[in-house]
Amino acid sequence: MRVSGALFLQFLLLVVPHISCWNDEAVLLRDVQVLTLYRGRYTTARRSSPVPQLQCIGGSAGCGSFTPEVVQCYNRGSDGIDAQWECKADMDNLYRFGRVEVSCEGYNSPNDAYVLRGSCGLEYTLELTAEGKQQQGSSGFSGFASNFFQGFSNQKQQQRGGGGDGGGPYQQHSYQNSPSGDGVGGLLVVAFLLLVAFVVYKMFLCSPTNGHQGFGGDQGYDSTNGAWDNSQGMGPPPPGFKPDYYSGDHSNSRPGYGFSDSYTRPQSSWTGFTGRTRPGGGGGGGGGFWTGMGTGGILGYLFGNQRRQPPMGFAGPTYNSNPSPAPKTSSGTRTASGFGTTKRR
């Protein structure tokens, strides 16, 4: 009787650790030969929460630049610790896999040799190839501005997309792909452009201040023959844009080799180099600049709205046609590979 009890105990010790293999949801990881993972799908979960099957975690290309549709990972054997994987996907020639890691949920614990069926996903970094780095370096500010204005246009279309009447076969569908951060990014870019315009205006177009009286003919410049009169002991001014930046000795001198005098003194209060003022002349030299810029912006906005506005009375169907950001041009696509190990959760 004691012998039979000892044998039964040994049988339990041998069988109980492998009971999980009788469960259809538990899979021995070393028996998994291929994983096919899709963009937009999630893994199964038992002890934790589902995670995306394809999850970018960084890289020089940025996670928002490209996401493969399908990735297949092949079990290439074990390094004595865990399974090693080779993952392949069709990618644009601008991008490549960096670090890849297959993440699976252990059935009973993170250290379990069995994993939950369907719980494996891929974490990867997305890097730029040599072609991608070259194109990124040549894009500069133009690509940034193009993406900004396209995103702003998409946001305006999204705001108009939900205005249709409900219930009919021609009900309008709202747009869903516009990013929520376009508004904040747009304000930042507009503020930056206004700052640049203000700096250019102050440096090159602003009228003289602090008592500068232009370039009178009795202050060292002979208006009759265009020569410089050095009788007052003042040399010609240094080259520059505005007399405001000169020293006190040259505050009343003729402008140097920068912009013409029409940009460095009030337009409405001087008739030339004679020092005479017009009757009732004003002093605001920047009004035309700001007025022109504001008028152009308003007209451009209204013209763009008219081009995108559908005809009145037309209630035809609209579709989710909000365009995605324009892709970068490249020489084509190829099958990219990445190599990595296993992570358990």
UniProtKB/Swiss-Prot annotation:
Residue intervals annotated with topology Lumenal: 22-183
Q: Where is the composition biased (Gly residues)?
A: 160-169, 278-289
Compositional bias per record (Polar residues), positions renumbered to this chain: 223-233, 318-345
Localization of this protein:
Endoplasmic reticulum membrane
A GO CC annotation recorded here is: endoplasmic reticulum membrane
Q: Which residues form the signal peptide?
A: 1-21
How is this protein situated with respect to the membrane? Single-pass type I membrane protein
Which keywords, in A-to-Z order, does the entry hold? Answer: Calcium, Calcium transport, Endoplasmic reticulum, Ion transport, Membrane, Signal, Transmembrane, Transmembrane helix, Transport
Q: Which residues cross the membrane?
A: 184-204
Which residue intervals are topologically Cytoplasmic?
205-345
Q: Which GO terms describe its biological process?
A: calcium ion transport; regulation of store-operated calcium entry
| Key word Signal present | yes
Q: Where is this region: Disordered?
A: 155-178, 223-289, 302-345
Kindly indicate whether the keyword Glycosyltransferase belongs to this entry: no
Function of the protein? Negative regulator of store-operated Ca(2+) entry (SOCE) involved in protecting cells from Ca(2+) overfilling. In response to cytosolic Ca(2+) elevation after endoplasmic reticulum Ca(2+) refilling, promotes a slow inactivation of STIM (stim1 or stim2)-dependent SOCE activity.
Which family is this sequence assigned to?
Answer: Belongs to the SARAF family.
**Protein name listed in UniProt:** Store-operated calcium entry-associated regulatory factor
Source species of the chain = Danio rerio (Zebrafish)
